[in-house]
Amino acid sequence: SPESVKANIEHYFAPLLLQDKSDNVAQTLKSIHKAINGNRFAKCAVQTALLDIQAQRLGVPLSELLGGRLRDSLPVLWTLASGDTDKDIAEAQKMIAAKRHNTFKLKIGVNPWQQDVEHVIAIKQALGSDISVRVDVNRAWSEMDCIKGIQALQDGGIDLVEQPCAIENTDALRRLTERFDVAIMADEALTGPFSAYRVAKQYGAHVFAVKIAQSGGLLEAKEVATVAKLAGIDLYGGTMLEGPIGTIASAHTFATFANLAFGTDLFGPLL
């Protein structure tokens, strides 16, 4: 929670940082990792601050410390979350008419898979073939439900299915990736470079959702992207619904990715 992250930074990270007199970010981060286990979100917050300070000191954009940006803009999708088919269609059509978004994601998994799939397909049919519609199942389906649900989504023209099964069941994720043409994306299964390597080693997804906080930092998110690149896995820039600071830190990171085939969902500040 934000409260626990704040408490950990105040009680454990701050004393280390106050003792550290170095302006070497890498050395400071090494000391933090040696002293503190886990705490990915807190480590990301501290790393973001350290890199931002260093970038300001050097007078360069933060992305320059991550290798330099390869793009000046990022595509951003919009999430449709009312749960009401007609309302979601109307909201999407409004966004399309305003030329704000042409890619949409729906969070599903609360209802029986048949009901969720019917809802998604109705929206896709209303928006047409030129609009990309994706779903985030949020780990809700069993492997059997995944087989039936993803087949229906694929037949209905859905472009991507995010984390359809349990985090721990990477074998099921691999089997689904092998079985379907629609892109299967790993999200919560990725908690940094090591988990990315485990999933990539068995080609357990077509796409990786990279999130700086979930990865443990901007540098670790870059490492996840490198693992994906070496394994031939596409990338998607994810969000934990950060505010402006986390969003711009993510944007600086994602702008350095050579491959960002599925865009981003950095819409937090737009809410």
Give the ranges of each region predicted by the language model:
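Predominant activation on well-ordered alpha-helical scaffold segments within soluble catalytic domains
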Residues: 6, 10-14, 47, 51-52, ...
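Conserved, mostly hydrophobic/aromatic
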Residues: 13, 46, 59, 104, ...
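Metal- or metallocofactor-binding catalytic centers and their adjacent structured scaffolds
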Residues: 1-57
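Glycine- and other small-residue-rich loops at beta-strand/loop junctions that grip anionic moieties
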Residues: 43, 81, 108-112, 135-139, ...
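Shared catalytic-loop signature of beta/alpha-barrel
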Residues: 157, 168-185, 190-271
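Glycine-rich, aromatic-flanked loop segments that form ligand/cofactor-binding clefts
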Residues: 48-80
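Metal-dependent enolase-superfamily TIM-barrel catalytic cores that perform enediolate-based chemistry
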Residues: 67-180
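Flexible, glycine/charged-enriched surface loops at secondary-structure junctions
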Residues: 23-25, 62-65, 160-167, 238-240
